[in-house]
Amino acid sequence: MTSFSSSSSMLFSGRSWRLIVPFYLLFHAVIISSTIIVTTEAADSPARLSFEIFPPDQIPPGATNGRLFVILSRSSSIQPRLTLGRTGMQRPQALARDVAAFSPGQPVTVGAKDFSFPATNLSQIPPGEYFVQALFDYNPDLRFANAPENLYSKVQKAGIDPAKDIAIKLALTEQIPPEKTPKETQFLKFVKLESKLLSKFYGRPIFLRAGIVLPKDFDKNQSQHYPLWVQIGGLNTRYTAVTTMIGTPSSFRETWLAEGTPRFILVHLDGAGPLGDPYYVDSQNNGPFGEALTKELIPYIEAHYRGVSPGKRVLSGVSTGGWVSLALQVFYPDYFSGAWSSCPDPVDFRALQLINLYDEENAFVEANGRERPSERDLRGKVTLTIREEVRAENLLGRNNCYTTSGEQWGEWTATFSPRGRDGSPIPIWDPTTGRIDREVANYWKRYDLRLYLEQHWAELAPNLRGKLHIASGEADQFYLNEAMHLLDHFLQEKKPSIEAKIVFGPGKGHGWFDLSVADTLKEMQAAVEKP
């Protein structure tokens, strides 16, 4: 989910998943090549706009079984590929199709039969001048369109008129560079660990990544050990987010290095995986990410960076990270000493945003026939519907389906759904009609945190006492406060009490948290010092 506002933004750093462009890519120069257009007058046949995409002469190993995009933009200020996935007024026109294999010198045609968004067919595209670019997304280990090693074309300026036969040729001559680990500093370290558990699940090497911020004076006393603060960002936030936290002047850096600040090793998890953000719980589709985290990554970090174990670990997160921090605390109640969660994703699937997943028939349409909202502004005005958002994800996902989009609805489905016979997540609802699959909805119950607490209360309550600290804005742009009220009501009524702290912020939006970094660290210190 998006992180809009926060009283401690460096602590709970999120990312707009509605606009999937990595921030640093916005400043890349747009390369515009000469336009290659073939136009023919076809009086005896329907007009057809098409794009012929040529693979590179040397096709990279593994550059098969991917998603091919053609993106059309009115603006030359940014490469069209970097706008892919946007919703609202800034969304580009795009076409997409799956490609199983490329042959050198043999183009793949993208045209009227392929998935189109936001226009549902090419005839709806307004005629005029566009900047056009092709992108081939094939990276199997990082599910986002502009992932490292994916192929793309130079930008071409083209006049487009759906009423004429126009064939535009684009060549995939460019490649996004491989991902590099940022430079380490005195306080900043990075881990890239091959996971035996995940590699076995996927049948190929899969790596766990994390950014680490060391406490002040870490090098001065080699015998001192520190508790771990495990942080999870908003949807798809990468582990490299720590570079802006400690690498540049900021309120976080000032607090972190101040005298009297409780000393922790901060571990920022990576929000990227083969199906997008893995949510760090065990899943039929993502694999055993929860087990890999608790049995491989955290023990490795504690062993190599003088962590205190066992049990001296706390969690925090915003949005997606808010849900993950709560889920890890609930699913591993003895392993962690507390979770500080801001605006978590839905914690009760009776309020999956505004969908009651267990009772309603359709995700797109309410019982009264009104389109169901997905996003609002702080004044309550609806800015996006679920139908429109899922269509945007259908563009990104394989088989024209959101389940592998690497975005919000796709990643919830990848995490919470069973695995289909084709190896893909089973859709929670039909990607075109929105009709909810009742059997799949029943499977999702195992990740419904409120329901899980209810079903396992007797065993969980003694180990969760005083460990849940949650903040939720009452004007949350994605209606996540609705589910939080259901959890709050449950925890207030349930006995014995676990003394959970849930704070609601009137008028506060998505990303709000009630504590400063300094106050949060003080509460975390008290938690790890408990016997």
Predicted features along the sequence, with ranges:
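Bacterial N-terminal signal peptides
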Residues: 20-35
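Contiguous beta-strand segments within globular domains
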Residues: 45-55, 61-68, 209
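Boundary at the C-terminal end of the N-terminal hydrophobic targeting segment
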Residues: 33, 40-44
